[in-house]
Amino acid sequence: MKLWQNNEHDTEITFYEAKNKCSDAAIVIFPGGAYAMRAEHEGKGYAEFFQSIGVNSFVVDYHVAPDYFPQPLLDARRAVRFVRANAEKYGINPEKIAVMGSSAGGHLTAMLSTYYAPIEGEDVDELDKVSFMPNAQILCYAVIRNPDTGISHEGSFRNLLGEKYDAMNKAVDPALIASPKTPQAFIWHTAADDGVNVINAYDYAASLKRCGVPVEMHVFPDGRHGLGVAPDFPHVAQWTGLLKNWLEYIGWKNEE
């Protein structure tokens, strides 16, 4: 399905219906790929996991470079608005919409959860009157920190911002702009990740804690970057079960 009703924006959102549905929540998924591409195993792969545990999900093919900021964020806001506006159609509670992303998709997830300023390109139709604020965020080895920290994934920021890189990289650092309005979070990462430093996760969790935002975080000692559901790393693969438990803990999923 197309998120925008004009030819200028071709963003697609794909619905994955739960098998044996046992939740009225929905997960909106933004795959990773350094804002240069979108990795299928971090989109469809996650959606298939949610299908298996009875939770509806949506995968968003948001814009990437050379379609720079704010277009990816416009797409992300539009996706949440679409799901919320169509909640009855999909059997979803409009106040139980989580956003989820890995790597750069994790940055988009966290940016959506923390960056609230109006953006040129909104207010194109009635859908833009619907709230874009998610009710929870799920971050998998997410890019968070800006390049000046020394622990950033610089390529993701450059692909997101283009010519706005120098002027805006701190403005889109979720650890700097989190607030008490930021939604609750589930975060996981691996300490051995040499693509995105695990301190990104620690810093964001600490920022959320300072803002009084509930956060659950898991760090596994081993495992490379980009694992997805981690089928070849049994110890890391526990994260999916931990996420299922968290959804039950916050009241978003019935216990099996």
Positions of PLM-derived features:
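Short beta-strand/loop motif that positions the catalytic acidic residue
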Residues: K181, I187-H189, D193
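Primarily recognizes the serine-hydrolase "nucleophile elbow" in alpha/beta-hydrolase
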Residues: R78-S152, N169
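Mobile cap/lid helix-loop segments that gate and shape the active-site cleft of serine hydrolases
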Residues: Q5, A142-I177
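Catalytic nucleophile-loop/oxyanion-hole region of alpha/beta-hydrolase
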Residues: A39-E40, G45, F58-P94, F233-Q238
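N-terminal cap/lid segment of alpha/beta-hydrolase-fold proteins
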Residues: M1-K21, I151-S152
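C-terminal catalytic histidine-bearing segment of alpha/beta-hydrolase fold enzymes
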Residues: Y202-E256
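Short beta-strand element of the alpha/beta-hydrolase
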Residues: D24-G32
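Conserved alpha/beta-hydrolase "acid-adjacent" motif
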Residues: D194-D203
